[in-house]
Amino acid sequence: MDANYQGLFYFIEKSIEKNPIPSDGLVLTYDDIKYGKSLGTTSKFPRDSIAFKWKDEVRETVLREIEWSASRTGLINPIAIFDPVELEGTTVSRASVHNVSVMRELKLGIGDRINVYKANMIIPQIRENLTCSNSIQIPENCPVCQSKTRIDNENGVETLVCPNPECQAKQIKSFTLFVSRDGMNI
């Protein structure tokens, strides 16, 4: 890439850091709309533009706990609790681990050194586990109603489930959805 463009990208990237409006990249396009349209498109993208994404801001921290959160559908999702770090202008100390498959893939354990980032500059995620102690146990009982849990496997993705239809988490979260703006708008 030409040094002039590299200098421009560096200047813009540094300017974005000071900008109060978040930006996750840059799109260059022709300023001649007629010429740009004449270039057409590929099967997915216009030929008159090119997009560049900034590297995600990544911070190292220490995993302190996994909180298991029951949902209205019965899924029990792992939430990573870690030492607070500054990411994209906010303090972050929690991130969804999504499901049992991701837990196992990351080989998480309490005290592990992990790298975290914000996906799309918004959603905290664990990028990698630097120590991989793999010592976290999957709960055998629902953290809310204490019913025996099961692991479902759909399309190769393992999820932890509370099968109890009377689980208080399911009832409370279903009621919360019912009275929400998207529900009855109460």
Language-model segments: residues:
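RNA/tRNA-interacting regions in translation and RNA-turnover enzymes
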Residues: M1-I186
